[in-house]
């Protein structure tokens, strides 16, 4: 089923008789019918945050995509949580979107995951002029939640760009990228492994078992023999990835 968003665009007004033009920023309902591969939201409990765990989880999705590109649509798409203040209040919802729904935010959000048809029924089809909205709403259109900024920055570094689509409920931005243009996908290489002890593992990066049935990723030290085209890893890494000597590993 199509996904429903607001799309931010420019509406051009022109009067030939008065000889003037004016550009207006507007939001209008937008049905996203084209296929895409959507990245889900990652939530880590506070006790497990830090030490690169969040970025490892996020990057592992791109590493899986690089190993199995035929399973995905060429375009990757992600929604980012919209801005809320320190009191957990959404200006976009409180001062704009909730006027269209006889629901609280969480109920509307819950229903939208099951069936978003009610959004098309509830919101007028004409464009909304942004400069007529409350200032505090204007300032947060397409602005990520403070807790989502690390994920937003990470995605931007992986060539994801805002596409003008805005979440209907919280005003959060949507980003997209061609999977083939994601740096972690472009840099992926496969090599057979050898398990080594007492050598200088002089490189550091993502190492993956690319198997569809046993996919796993670590970020660890390794070494590479350029002449033999062989990856040297420790027994600890091999065990974590369920790899045996001669198995193929992917490095990014």
Describe the predicted segments one by one.
Residues 1-41, 100, 105-113, 117, ...:
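Conserved acyl-donor/pantetheine-binding loop and adjacent beta-alpha core of acyl/acetyltransferases
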Residues 22, 41-44, 49-65:
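Conserved acetyl-CoA-binding loop-helix of GNAT-fold acetyltransferases
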Residues 33-42, 62-81, 91, 138-142:
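Conserved GNAT acetyl-CoA-binding A-motif
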Residues 57-58, 70-111:
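Glycine- and acidic-residue-rich phosphate-binding/metal-coordinating active-site segment common to enzymes
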Residues 92-144:
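Aromatic-anchored, glycine/proline-accented short structural segments
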Residues 129-199:
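Anionic-ligand-binding alpha/beta catalytic cores of soluble enzymes and soluble regulatory domains
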Residues 203-210, 246-252:
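Short conserved beta-strand and strand-loop elements enriched in small hydrophobics
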Residues 214-246:
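Short beta-strand-centered segments at strand-helix junctions
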């Amino acid at each position: 089923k199509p996904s429903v968003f607001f799309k931010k665009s420019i509406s051009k007004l022109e009067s030939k008789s008065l000889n003037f033009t004016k550009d207006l920023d507007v939001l209008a309902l937008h049905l996203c019918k084209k296929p895409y591969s959507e990245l889900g939201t990652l939530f880590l409990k506070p006790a497990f945050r830090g030490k690169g765990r969040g970025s490892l989880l996020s990057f592992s999705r791109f590493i899986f995509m690089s190993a199995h590109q035929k399973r995905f649509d060429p375009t990757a798409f992600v929604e980012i949580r919209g801005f809320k203040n320190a009191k957990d209040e959404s200006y976009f919802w409180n001062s704009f979107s909730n006027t269209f729904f006889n629901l609280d935010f969480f109920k509307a959000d819950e229903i939208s995951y099951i069936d978003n048809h009610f959004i098309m029924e509830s919101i007028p089809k004409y464009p909304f002029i942004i400069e007529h909205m409350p200032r505090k709403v204007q300032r947060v259109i397409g602005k990520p939640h403070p807790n989502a900024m690390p994920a937003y920055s990470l995605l931007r570094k992986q060539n994801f760009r805002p596409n003008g689509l805005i979440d209907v409920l919280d005003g959060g931005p949507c980003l997209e990228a061609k999977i083939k243009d994601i740096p972690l996908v472009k840099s992926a290489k496969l090599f057979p492994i050898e398990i080594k002890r007492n050598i200088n593992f002089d490189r550091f990066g993502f190492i993956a078992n690319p198997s569809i049935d046993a996919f796993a990723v670590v970020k660890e030290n390794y070494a590479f023999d350029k002449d033999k085209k062989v990856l040297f890893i420790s027994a600890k890494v091999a065990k974590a990835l369920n790899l045996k000597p001669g198995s193929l590993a992917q490095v990014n």
